[in-house]
């Protein structure tokens, strides 16, 4: 959209952010999957429905994007405004479909595992997710190689539409295969043997459960700070490597690969060894400390402008992120009730989605503020490092804030509060 079609950066950013703006729907979809089974199943039908919807919307996005591009070139009003609104609306619907697919999926992980099994299950799931992203990126890059250098919309649109259709069909087929026989018919019991799911819990009652324990707000706030500590630097990392370390564009793009390798190792190590040996809270504390230390190293290595050191730090940062992510996800899955697992997963997913969106905005805003304060924006200072140091410094403080909040998380207190509230809800419903 930015290069071939010449879309304004603000338009691209806002359209993509529309996917995050609908994040509150995760709570609703989680509660719906708790209370309303489809085809006698609470999770898999919603996963398949959401997948079918976001695959269809992905295919529809291609002609709409090219339509907006042609109207931008022609400057036709008011058709351009309507097309932009339609594009933003489509990305919003795409976000709804993603929420519909992913929230019941995470609830299914809770339904199908015990507390002891979850660290390893989470590690395997997120490792395979990372591997899948890498394989998908390689396959997409290889498949679109013939389109390199082509900017003619008349050639690009039919080629990309056909390509997206093939990808959508493949994604849906893989999803069907992956979820086949993963959920038994809803007989009112979880696969792990915990008691019946109460289909009568309404959205209002679920909201009562969410507000019943201060631990919900504490962990919600922790997830926001933790996710910000991971991704606040994301929108400025490549420019940090280019301007401070003098790396070429192709090399800066490879930094994500170093981070990804570290994350993969961290997820495996956490799932197999760290979480089982230290416990979920202990592993989460270790992850937060390692993330804070990695951010400090990322800041300090900018003083040396050493590219090899930067690559090592990115691997260490990924390792810390993997350990922290695994333990935080295990905590997230523990801080639920079996009867309303989807609802609580939706709440935690909302925290993560909001913080990812906030990270994109705040990261870029802090960089602009740093440039303004250091004078580099006006050309008064030739040194770009102080502006990036502000971003990384704030991110370091955010990681420490997440660590402090983590000390207040109490899984036992959460279960006691929400369990008592659930009993009251069910008693009131039976009267």
Where are these regions (language model features)?
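A late C-terminal transmembrane helix in Major Facilitator Superfamily
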Residues: 341-372
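Intracellular loop-helix junctions on the cytosolic face of multi-pass helical membrane proteins
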Residues: 78-89, 96, 100-101, 105-106, ...
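Helix-to-loop junctions at the C-terminal end of transmembrane segments
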Residues: 24-40, 266-282
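Short amphipathic helix-loop junctions that connect adjacent transmembrane helices
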Residues: 1-11, 235-252
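Intracellular juxtamembrane helix-capping segments at the cytosolic ends
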Residues: 100-113, 323-337
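C-terminal ends and interior cores of transmembrane alpha-helices
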Residues: 48-80, 289-305
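Loop-to-transmembrane helix entry/capping segments in MFS-fold secondary transporters
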Residues: 9-10, 84, 115-125, 249-250, ...
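C-terminal transmembrane helical hairpin of 12-TM major facilitator-type secondary transporters
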Residues: 284-328
């Amino acid at each position: 959209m930015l290069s071939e079609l010449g879309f304004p950066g603000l338009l691209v950013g806002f359209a993509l952010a529309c996917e995050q703006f609908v994040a509150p729907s995760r709570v609703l979809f989680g509660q719906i999957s708790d209370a309303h089974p489809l085809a006698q199943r609470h999770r898999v039908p919603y996963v398949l429905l959401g997948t079918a919807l976001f695959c269809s919307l992905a295919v529809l996005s291609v002609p709409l994007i090219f339509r907006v591009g042609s109207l931008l070139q022609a400057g036709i009003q008011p058709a351009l405004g309507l097309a932009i609104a339609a594009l933003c609306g489509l990305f919003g619907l795409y976000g709804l479909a993603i929420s519909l697919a992913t929230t019941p999926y995470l609830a299914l992980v809770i339904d199908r595992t015990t507390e002891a099994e979850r660290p390893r299950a989470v590690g395997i799931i997120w490792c395979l997710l990372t591997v899948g992203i890498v394989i998908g990126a390689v396959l997409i890059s290889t498949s679109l190689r013939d389109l390199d250098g082509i900017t003619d919309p008349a050639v690009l649109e039919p080629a990309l539409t056909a390509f997206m259709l093939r990808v959508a069909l493949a994604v849906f087929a893989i999803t069907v295969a992956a979820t086949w026989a993963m959920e038994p018919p809803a007989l009112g019991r979880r696969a792990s043997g915990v008691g019946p799911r109460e289909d009568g819990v309404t959205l209002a009652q679920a909201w009562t459960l969410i507000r019943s324990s201060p631990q919900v707000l504490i962990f919600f706030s922790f997830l926001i700070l933790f996710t910000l500590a991971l991704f606040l630097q994301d929108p400025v990392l490549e420019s940090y490597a280019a301007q401070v370390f003098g790396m070429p564009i192709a090399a800066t793009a490879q930094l994500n690969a170093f981070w990804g390798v570290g994350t993969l190792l961290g997820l495996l190590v956490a799932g197999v060894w760290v979480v089982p040996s230290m416990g979920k809270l202990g592993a989460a504390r270790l992850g937060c400390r390692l993330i804070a230390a990695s951010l400090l190293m990322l800041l300090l290595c900018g003083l040396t402008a050493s590219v090899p050191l930067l690559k090592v730090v990115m691997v260490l940062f990924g390792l810390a992120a993997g350990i922290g992510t695994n333990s935080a996800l295990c905590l997230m899955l523990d801080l639920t009730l079996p009867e309303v697992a989807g609802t609580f997963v939706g709440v935690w997913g909302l925290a993560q989605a909001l913080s990812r969106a906030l990270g994109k905005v705040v990261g870029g805003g802090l960089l602009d503020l740093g440039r303004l304060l250091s004078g580099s924006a006006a050309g008064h200072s030739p040194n770009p490092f102080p502006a990036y140091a502000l971003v990384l410094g704030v991110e370091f403080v955010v990681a420490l804030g997440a660590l402090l909040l983590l000390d207040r998380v109490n899984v036992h207190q959460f279960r006691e509060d929400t369990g008592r509230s659930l009993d009251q809800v069910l008693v009131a419903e039976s009267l």
